[in-house]
Amino acid sequence: MSNNIHQELNSNVEDAEQSDFRKGVVDWIKHNNPKDPGFLLPQTFMEVGSEQVLDFLREWQYKVWSSGYLGMAWPREYGGQGMSRQFQQIADEEMKKARVPICFNVIGLGWAGPLIIDTGSDFEKQTYLKGILTGDDIWCQGFSEPNHGSDLGSIQTRAERDGDEYIINGSKIWTTMGNFAKYMIL
């Protein structure tokens, strides 16, 4: 067996710490899974259709984050737990199994946040990351354009420098989560 395959197999086996963590997640879900809110919960972030649903999901996301089960691989100084991604994967797996509500800020959590962590300035990290995790600052994506959809190679929108700022020129046909977002990733 080659070293790479051996390492890959070992990385898929939980150690005692991860196993204990999984048990803790399952126990937390058992005691914190919210009661029926009286309306149909969305299965994806694109199904969030009202302020009532948004408020419910925002409260849930805050609870998940404040309990330490969201942003686990994000740096501590910006609201994360500073742990390995495997712990976040375990928490996500158990939440999916238990069919708990979604953490709806998917564009912030999956795109904007990691990009800011990897390439952002300290100011940007301080300004944006914690709000993404708590659900206070919702992000949307602004890629789709008339006649091009989300074909990033055909985007006509341009950012033009104007002194210390950039002016964004272009048009969009829909903006996923745009009706609730505070920030947009382009």
Set out the residue ranges of the language-model regions:
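N-terminal glycine-rich flavin-associated loop
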Residues: 104-123, 149
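A short, Trp-centered hydrophobic/proline-enriched beta-strand micro-motif
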Residues: 135-143
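Amphipathic, small/basic residue-rich leader segments at the start of a protein or domain
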Residues: 1-106, 124-127, 131-134
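A short core secondary-structure module
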Residues: 156, 164-165, 169-186
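Adenylate-forming
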Residues: 112-116, 142, 183-186
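Hydrophobic, small-residue-rich alpha-helical packing segments that form membrane-like cores
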Residues: 148-151, 166
